[in-house]
């Protein structure tokens, strides 16, 4: 199942806001070296948009088998996308604050151009009936939007779209 989303705005506000007022509120100018912080795009959006119970003991972690199966499906989908498809594109953005330097980083599953428009593809393999999805899972969309923002910023692009590719791990559809 592929869901294409063209940008409603020219930028993603999540990271833009981080570059602006949130990161510079401290207002202190210490001569000490800035603290270096690193976070993956996935961990950032999962933390920001976390829902549900604050007790995470009952949430089950993804099994090693499911992770291996997800990796296999990713590679299969990426391999079927054609020569113009760039797979596993590393992206990072450094956000400077007064007291620290935050590096937001990750890998876009794929980047491609279609009809003159650039898209970031976020692939998700899962044990759900993906054919019933009418819209992307919000946190998955947020992850793709962050990758798209970083890629667009680094390539001086005013617009960029995202594509969510969902695949059932059992049926491979």
Stretches found by the model and what they are:
Residues 93-173:
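Mg2+/Mn2+-dependent nuclease catalytic core
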